[in-house]
Amino acid sequence: MRLAQLSHESLNFPPPDRALREPNGLLAMGGDLSPQRLLNAYHRGIFPWFAAGDPILWWSPDPRAILLPQHFHLSRSMKRFHQKSPYRVTLNQRFRQVIEGCASDRQEGTWITYEVKLAWQRLHELGHAHSIEVWQDEELVGGMYGLALGQIFCGESMFSQGENASKTALLVFSRYFLQQGGKLIDCQVLNPHTQSLGAQEIPRASYLSYLHSLAFRPLSSECWSPQRLF
């Protein structure tokens, strides 16, 4: 099957079920990272991922990795650590620093290019993208960022420069998101780290059904206000 080439004039995407099986989920290439195109993509279960120097590639893998916040897996060792945690956790206080941390945390190169950083910073300024920060004293030691779609949060990346810092970010955010009425955290593709924290795979069609029913159910406006979570 020929890979769809996106134009700069149209925000349309092919249906996700046209994505390739190998590599799993590759759907289209080209276009741009404008806020409108990114929001259009995520509302359709599509996200960009590409290496520096490559064209923009768009993906919708099958199966899809998700985390139901109420099913976050808290190991006994992590529970003990969290009970005596040296960290505090905040929301939307250092978005730029979090995305820089995620980019620099990749030892073998990163897909978080300058172009990607600018695109996500713009989404943050528009109120769509959000960051969770983990602090030890006044040092930022971990965090995560992603996109809010109603009762769904699309997690993009996380970083850790302190013991269990990224786990702390996801743990605290999962509890907060659930309390605020959040239903699902999109993890895109399953990896050992997110699987250990309770992420699971579901069919792409099931994820698209979640999107259809949850993405346009807004949370309270105060949900994303800069604040301390833990």
UniProtKB/Swiss-Prot annotation:
The keyword Cytoplasm applies. Its EC number is 2.3.2.6. One of its GO terms (biological process) is protein catabolic process. Keywords: Acyltransferase, Cytoplasm, Transferase. Its main location: cytoplasm. GO terms for molecular function: leucyl-tRNA--protein transferase activity. It catalyses: N-terminal L-lysyl-[protein] + L-leucyl-tRNA(Leu) = N-terminal L-leucyl-L-lysyl-[protein] + tRNA(Leu) + H(+); N-terminal L-arginyl-[protein] + L-leucyl-tRNA(Leu) = N-terminal L-leucyl-L-arginyl-[protein] + tRNA(Leu) + H(+); L-phenylalanyl-tRNA(Phe) + an N-terminal L-alpha-aminoacyl-[protein] = an N-terminal L-phenylalanyl-L-alpha-aminoacyl-[protein] + tRNA(Phe). Signal peptide: none annotated. The keyword Iron does not apply. Pfam families: Leu_Phe_trans. One of its GO terms (cellular component) is cytoplasm. It is found in: Cytoplasm. PANTHER family: LEUCYL/PHENYLALANYL-TRNA--PROTEIN TRANSFERASE (PTHR30098), LEUCYL_PHENYLALANYL-TRNA--PROTEIN TRANSFERASE (PTHR30098:SF2). Functions in the N-end rule pathway of protein degradation where it conjugates Leu, Phe and, less efficiently, Met from aminoacyl-tRNAs to the N-termini of proteins containing an N-terminal arginine or lysine. HAMAP family: Leu_Phe_trans (MF_00688). Belongs to the L/F-transferase family. This is Leucyl/phenylalanyl-tRNA--protein transferase. It comes from Erwinia tasmaniensis (strain DSM 17950 / CFBP 7177 / CIP 109463 / NCPPB 4357 / Et1/99). The lineage of its organism: Bacteria, Pseudomonadati, Pseudomonadota, Gammaproteobacteria, Enterobacterales. The gene is aat.
